[in-house]
Design a protein with these regions (language model features):
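Short hydrophobic beta-strand element within catalytic cores of glycosyltransferases
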Residues: 294-297
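Short N-terminal targeting/anchoring amphipathic segment
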Residues: 71-90, 94, 104-107
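Conserved acidic donor-binding segment of nucleotide-sugar-dependent glycosyltransferases
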Residues: 308-310, 314-322, 330-336
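Nucleotide-activated donor-binding/catalytic signature segment of Leloir-type glycosyltransferases, i.e.
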Residues: 237-255
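Conserved donor-binding/catalytic core segment of Leloir-type glycosyltransferases
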Residues: 186-214, 225
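A short, active-site helix/loop in glycosyltransferases that binds the activated sugar's phosphate group
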Residues: 133-177
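Nucleotide-sugar donor phosphate/pyrophosphate-binding loop at the beta->alpha transition
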Residues: 105-107, 114-135, 151
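Short alpha-helical donor nucleotide-sugar binding micro-motif in glycosyltransferases
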Residues: 254-255, 262-267
Length: 368
């Protein structure tokens, strides 16, 4: 089967949506012919994947939204469409295409709600929001990382009325690429790690709360590594400076795949302090757990289902620096608890999120 995968962002832009698109394409390519369509972005390098990626110049774009009118003609060559939602501007093109091509299969992956839009983004996304339910009605299936997230999302009502249309497929992680050090030498300095975008599109990651929590830690032998880049980095650097801990917070910038794997292995604790439902899952949690690192994440729908609170890590109240401080302290001042959670995290990553297990679930959806 020839499948057109459509996604609003794709590497080198960092983010979970693009990462999952690569994973899905690789999985589906074992049984199908897959082409990924995504908007042109500045400085996109040539890569091994590029022969399976078509970057289209949008007629209009704003943020991650883009109007790819060319798709309407290009989709004629494909038997099926895999649309990563949200994709304002292009989701409407898919909806319109399906009206005239009812036999073309459509599977949608619902990644996340979109909150905190600017006024212009709200105006530009209005057609997509208006046609959303019509588009979902056209879909053969709607996949998602967590049904818990869907049940508490902006499409909860649609899910309640069409539960059989939805299929939960958690994201996966390469447990050979992300794995613990064989002979780790413990350091007196406890390393806390955050990985994620530092741009306005990822405002919801809660880095400001993480910095505030770190400044209140009751012990001094810690270091915070922040891996990622974006237009908010200067703001976070200034916050760290204002809190008097510029020397204890390292902004590592955007790391390549090998550097990222190494930085996970060197961490004592991983933190994902997201503040709202723009965070739907957290692939970075899988990468950390596979690396044998205990995790702390916000008690948000979807995110809270990635691991078991008290086993592989701890959940926190969203946007609560004090609770985050207490949970960091609890793990990093108890070596036995840290070790126990690290081992459990690695075990869960292998048993539930290994690529082999997750890939089979995705292939089953397309077979059926």
């Amino acid at each position: 089967m020839k499948i057109a995968q459509i996604v609003c962002v794709y590497p080198p832009y960092a983010g979970g949506i693009g990462t999952s698109a690569i994973q899905f394409a690789k999985t589906l390519s074992t049984d199908h012919e897959v082409m990924t369509f995504t908007p042109v972005i500045k400085d996109a390098p040539a890569s091994a994947e590029d022969k399976h990626v078509t970057r289209l110049k949008p007629l209009l774009s704003h943020g991650h939204g883009a109007l790819l009118l060319q798709l309407f003609c290009r989709l004629n060559k494909y038997d099926a469409i895999y649309l990563h939602y949200p994709f304002f501007g292009t989701a409407e093109i898919v909806w319109l295409y399906k009206i005239f091509h009812k036999k073309t299969r459509l599977i949608i992956h619902y990644h996340m709600d979109v909150r905190g839009l600017s006024l212009i983004a709200k105006i530009l996304s209005w057609p997509s929001r208006l046609t959303k339910n019509c588009l979902f009605n056209q879909a053969d299936k709607i996949t998602c990382g967590s049904l818990d997230y869907i049940a508490n999302s902006q499409i909860a009502k649609y899910y309640k009325n069409h539960p059989n249309k939805f299929v939960e497929i958690p994201f996966g992680v390469d447990t050979e690429k992300f794995k613990p050090l064989d002979n780790r030498i413990e350091s007196k300095i406890k390393t806390i790690l955050f990985v994620g975008g530092l741009d306005q599109a990822h405002y919801f990651k809660g880095i400001d709360y993480l910095l505030e929590a770190a400044s209140q830690l009751p012990f001094s032998n810690w270091q915070l590594n922040i891996a990622g880049a974006g237009n908010l980095q200067k703001q976070y650097e200034e916050q760290a400076k204002d809190l008097g801990m510029a020397d204890k917070v390292k902004f590592l910038g955007k790391l390549n795949a090998n550097e990222l794997a190494e930085i996970y292995r060197s961490a004592d604790l991983f933190v994902l302090p997201s503040i709202n439902s723009n965070e739907a899952f957290g692939i970075v949690l899988l990468e950390a757990m596979a690396s044998g690192v205990p995790v702390i994440a916000s008690n948000l729908p979807g995110v809270r289902t990635v691991f078991q609170n008290g086993i592989e890590g701890l959940t926190i109240k969203p946007a609560n620096a004090n609770d985050l401080k207490e949970k960091i302290t609890k793990i990093l001042t108890d070596p036995e608890l840290q070790k126990k959670m690290a081992q459990a995290a690695r075990r869960l990553a292998i048993e539930k999120y290994s690529l082999a297990k997750v890939d089979n679930q995705l292939l089953d959806v397309w077979k059926n």
